[in-house]
Amino acid sequence: MAREFSRADRVAQELQKEIAIILQREVKDPRIGMVTVSDVEISRDLAYAKVFVTFLFDSDESAVERGLEGLNKASGYIRTLVGKAMRLRIVPELRFVYDQSLVEGMRMSNLVTNVIRKDQERYVEEE
């Protein structure tokens, strides 16, 4: 019977949980601040993982850059802690990337809201 999710998907999901816990409890770099792991994409051979993150201070681009720099500098340490927490033959090499999807989703939502508001104003003026 075929599984609903591949092994890579299951490992990515577990990796997301472990990295979130590690970032919350273990990493003390002040550049990182409040970070959320939104998604993890892992290669089929489980050797590389792209970790998508968002920050509490999304509006400040320089703070986001500093946060990503801190995360990528700490990726070796995080990888070591992940290796201790998960039983994997090969612990994936971690690369942290800022997740633009939430910002883009909010921008699209604001555009739709503005169009609806303008349409309602125009409808009221016509009556």
Curated annotation (Swiss-Prot):
Where, subcellularly, is it found? Answer: Cytoplasm
The reply on keyword Cytoplasm is yes
UniProt function note: One of several proteins that assist in the late maturation steps of the functional core of the 30S ribosomal subunit. Associates with free 30S ribosomal subunits (but not with 30S subunits that are part of 70S ribosomes or polysomes). Required for efficient processing of 16S rRNA. May interact with the 5'-terminal helix region of 16S rRNA.
UniProtKB keywords: Cytoplasm, Ribosome biogenesis
Q: Which family does it belong to?
A: Belongs to the RbfA family.
Say where the protein is mainly found.
Answer: cytoplasm
The residues that cross the membrane are: none
Say if the entry is tagged with keyword Cytoplasm: yes
Q: Which domain of life is it from?
A: Bacteria
Secretion signal: which residues? Answer: none
Q: Which NCBIfam families match?
A: rbfA
- Provide the protein name: Ribosome-binding factor A
- Please give an example of a GO cellular component term from this record: cytosol
Annotated GO biological processes are: maturation of SSU-rRNA
Instruction: Kindly give the Gene3D superfamilies that the UniProt entry links to this protein.
Output: 3.30.300.20
**Which gene carries the instructions for this protein?**
rbfA
Q: Which GO terms describe its molecular function?
A: ribosomal small subunit binding
Subunit structure, as described in the record: Monomer. Binds 30S ribosomal subunits, but not 50S ribosomal subunits or 70S ribosomes.
Q: Which InterPro entries match?
A: KH_dom-like_a/b (IPR015946), RbfA (IPR000238), RbfA_dom_sf (IPR023799), Ribosome-bd_factorA_CS (IPR020053)
